Amino acid sequence: MNQASDEKALVVLSGGQDSTTCLYWALRRFGAGKVEAVTFDYGQRHRVELDCARKIAALAGVRQTVLPIDTFAAIGGNALTDASIAPEEGVRDDDALPNTFVPGRNLVFLTFAAAFAYTRGARHLVTGVAQTDYSGYPDCRENTLKALEVALRLGMDSRVELHTPLMYLSKAETVTLAQQVGALEALAWSHTCYNGEVPPCGHCASCELRAKGFAEAGVPDPLVERCQAEAQGL
């Protein structure tokens, strides 16, 4: 069995609101010097998030590694990796999966992350997936993650543990958690917009959910404030 440290953690950092919050949660949970980040370049439409992830990792003072996975772009069929498909606007009110669903993405990401953590002697994997609010992505559900954790433990003969701090939090509760763990400054550099726009487009489902969460939490969005200040030359 791999003798991984009970203290080391690897965070899957996309550069978005949720993964940024989880990075700072991990720093509180495991301590500075015990946390690394891994980011996946999978041919995503919103390429700006890769730059955001680098900036946020630097702000947090954690080592970051970017791993390329070009398979999803080759498969296509969804709005995040296929340039011919525009992301749907607004939040769906039915049970159908949105066209931003990338089949198998989180399963692949976490499998690669587990392999990477194995080589680093880290036992803990932290991811920002959540099954509340919107999307209904099947690879964000707790039962999926629990099953994957079992498979990773068996397949790598390790004691890997998946942490999902946001699993049952609403977007407003996620904002509150970000406050508690000191992530608000870093969230000014995070990226959520499916269209890859800065300032955020404001009308894709991801932008709408982010805005709703900050509004319900009664907290100004640091990203919006930064963009407004830059537009005013401040």
From Swiss-Prot:
Residues that bind Zn(2+): C193, C201, C204, C207
Reactions this protein catalyses: 7-carboxy-7-deazaguanine + NH4(+) + ATP = 7-cyano-7-deazaguanine + ADP + phosphate + H2O + H(+)
Entry-linked Pfam families: QueC
Cofactor binding annotation: Binds 1 zinc ion per subunit.
Enzyme class: ligase
Transmembrane parts of this sequence: none
Keyword Zinc: yes
Family: Belongs to the QueC family.
Protein name: 7-cyano-7-deazaguanine synthase
Gene that specifies this protein: queC
